[in-house]
Amino acid sequence: MDSLVPQKRSSEDDTPLEVNGFSKKSRDEDVSMHSPVDDETSASEDEDIGVLEYESAAATSNDPKWQKTVENVVKSVVSIHFSQVANFDTESALCSEATGFIVDAKLGIILTNRHVVGPGPFVGYAVFDNHEECEVKPIYRDPVHDFGFLKFNPEDIKYMEVRELALRPDLAKVGCEIRVIGNDSGEKLSILSGFISRLDRNTPDYGPNTYNDFNTEYIQAAASASGGSSGSPVVNCDGYAVALQAGGNSESSTDFFLPVYRVLRALNCVQNNEPITRGTIQVQWMLEPFDKCRRLGLRADSEKAMREKFPALNGLLVSSITLPEGPADGLIKEGDCLLAINGEPISTFIKVDDILDSHIGQEIEIEIQRGGKDMKVKCTVGDLHKITPNRYLSVCGATFNDLSYQLARLYSIPVKGLYVNNASGSFSLNNIVNGWIFDSIDDKDTPDLDTFIEVMKNIPDRAYVTLKYRHLSDLHVPLFKVVCIDRHWNSSFRLATRNDDTGLWDFTDLQDKPLDAPELTPKNAKFIDLPIEFESCKQLDRSFALVHSTIPIPLDSFSGHNRRVYGVVIDAEKGYIFTSRHCVPHDLVDITVTISESIIIPGKVVFLHPTKGYAIVKYDPSLVLAPVQTPQFSDKALERGEKIIFIGYNKNLRVVVDETKVSDIAVINLPTNATSPRFKATNIEAILIDSNLGQQCGSGLLCNKEGQVKAFWLAFDGDEDKVYSMGIDVTDVMWELEFLKNGQLPNLKVIDVEFCSVSILSARITGVPEEWISKIEEKCTDKLQLMSVPKISIKLDNKPSCELKHGDTILSVNDKLITRFRDIDLVIRNLATDVDEVDFKIVRHKQVMNLKVKLSNTSEFTTSQVVYWCGAVLQEPHHGVRQVIKSLPSGVYCTAMTQGSPSRFYTIGVTNFITHVNEQPTPNLNEFLKVIKSIKEKSYCKIRIVSFDNIPFAQTLKVNYHYFPTSELLKDPETKEWKEIEIEAEK
């Protein structure tokens, strides 16, 4: 998770901080230490832990006592490398680094922050002072306060004495000189110095929808710690841990430390094998100064009594939030000043915690002052652990848990409800992954996780159901959506439950298989004529259908997403739709087709053109009773300047119409997505129009006044997230689809290179003879140009796709003069079916040459195998990669990595190639599978990797099959259906 960088505030603590206010010190390490962009290894793997790094003048002083203290303390400090492997509650899956220190050497207990241990699944290891490492498991994370315990086996540390630090919260004093010794900014060991300036600071606010500590004082000092120092011990000159580093202001040198009073109590419970009880009345208190308490109604005599009782006291605890339906609801109100509990005067949060933790299920008497009046209220203390979720559900690609006390407190709502911690798959909601509350699904209320589970068991796969939901940031606005239940791609329907004995989360499958999809019945629908003056064009709306693709798996470098565009029905009798590969990038998708915004039916990908950027989708026409029509297609190509009618669908999927003209027709070379190459359309005669509506619409058509379709209007993916809208002439593609009339799939032949146009001037410079230039000038009636080759693809065997080379200028193909790509297309169109090469006459190095150029079949361009391993999505290098790269290091290409997975933790790297595993070659996916089957659970393997830029490096990776099992997706060559195979590793 990126660091939350706050604005510096000058007001007192009674004002909540900005959302970008403070940063928990390890939060930015997912980017800086295990970045999916940088793919850099951490400094800790490369630098000597024995060389202490002193980062301030005070730390480098020659005080022998401090030097001795530091030498002792560093033996207890460990660097924690960890992954939070799944979204849960307030936390997102991530890989990061932090600090911890040993508090019990005999039992092997490490103290660190709660936001490091996390509320959800945790995997990590600790690196000690001498570079020994051992696995750690979480044994406790506090529901509220920012501390948790990790456990390791002391016997695993063989070459150094395991030392512990004693906790002495009583030694934290204003003015006390301290050292923060930890993993600051990812450095292996940094020593930061400072002086304690406050003991009574309210907890920092890290923002909404994230973990925040509360109901405790924090210690403040200026130590300039940063990311990675979370969990560092704050020690005094005598070597005692007086506090725990927790957070800080990233715009100043201010740091915040957690007092270790309650930490010490929890540690004693663990050491004595006793439960760590945590009580609550669901009230948040704030420490407010006496001047504010007076304004809230505190009487002078009460202030005097409290000051005399506690001379060092500067304020009182004042209620800030009382949760509805909690134990104190209706009894304690905002602004009440706390005086005593069970007759014992209260001056600090520590005493409140002590009383609540020891009175769970018991009634306590709370004395408060409200508006100058003394009041005594009685309420029963609840169990804080019972309102802290320890389970999550995975279904339909999303994950859920019961609403936690943490989030309920942030928004002052009852601690109940179904919370979505990862809204994806069937439940993708506005690209916001968390913060959602589901009120009902399929018209059935879902007040909690258990109810939701029972509801989901009775919903069939592929069923459409209604969803009512809200976002925590705007609970006043109820939202409504129709969702399609996906239990086939996202087949997991299991409950994960925390197991504090093993440190793992145990998975329970809740249903063997979903209910069968509901049977579809034919339906009718009404069309409304287009708002256009030409009668022949009004009914073209009957030739449009909305194509909705759901991409469940990041394949071919396309991340999972949903896309919707309108396609043109090219054969209503057989149910074929012409649409864009922007919407249908590959065939590992779910397709639905919507007719007239009324009928929704499943579709299927039947053809993907490897270069021209279009796809053919098929639906069952027997399910549609509406009068869908096949439009008339023109057999004459468009010309520049020709008047046409543009009918398009904008981003809101509303139809727009404009009379315009063709402004240009040219071969457009789209930019390649540099960060992760993916499919891009090439070698198309792109049609541009003289209308601003063109770039506002991602789908549509161009027609004449007689209603004849002249061109398809499509969206094309470019670099980054840019989308380009252009037309493609029907005469350039309809001949390729003649197979469909006979019920056959197109198996076309293409030249797998990218062509571009060059001017006569450039042609002369490159050596094209004048006689050929004269021929070009004589033939051209629109643009004076020739075709050249800027890029050549390679095949999986690392050979060039054909005999052409970069920079070749094309003169003729099969003795036909070439001035545009359409000329090459026509030559291929007229070839006999058994011909697989054509004759090119080219200019290369200012020499005219004749070449035999081989053609490629379209069947060579689709992906048919995917492997999941340790969170990495691996496949053979797809066509988008082979269009760009010069040489393939391996046939195992990483196209995506899961957050929090070993692949991201150990930085396999997206766009990288795995060439060897444990020194065994992995030239393809099948060989890779053979090798990894021998790697046992929780064991390390060595991986040799080559980057996209051909830079080799080696990496080690520790497998984790419990959270990230190995599986394979295979496409059946006959049925074209995908199936998943689980791969079992050796035990």
Predicted regions and their residues:
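Residue-level recognition of conserved beta-strand edge/terminus positions
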Residues: 81, 127, 181, 237, ...
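Conserved active-site neighborhood of the chymotrypsin/trypsin-like protease fold
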Residues: 53-56, 85-87, 93-95, 104-190, ...
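A short, Trp-centered hydrophobic/proline-enriched beta-strand micro-motif
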Residues: 72-87, 180, 538-555, 646
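A short, polar/charged loop-to-alpha-helix boundary motif
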Residues: 123, 251-261, 449-452, 590, ...
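Short conserved beta-strand and strand-loop elements enriched in small hydrophobics
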Residues: 80, 122-130, 178-183, 363-369, ...
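Active-site region of chymotrypsin-like
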Residues: 153-165, 190-253, 257, 317-320, ...
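Soluble non-cytosolic domains of exported or imported proteins
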Residues: 60, 64, 169-172, 190, ...
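C-terminal recognition in membrane/secretory proteostasis and scaffolding
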Residues: 2-45, 68, 101, 105-106, ...
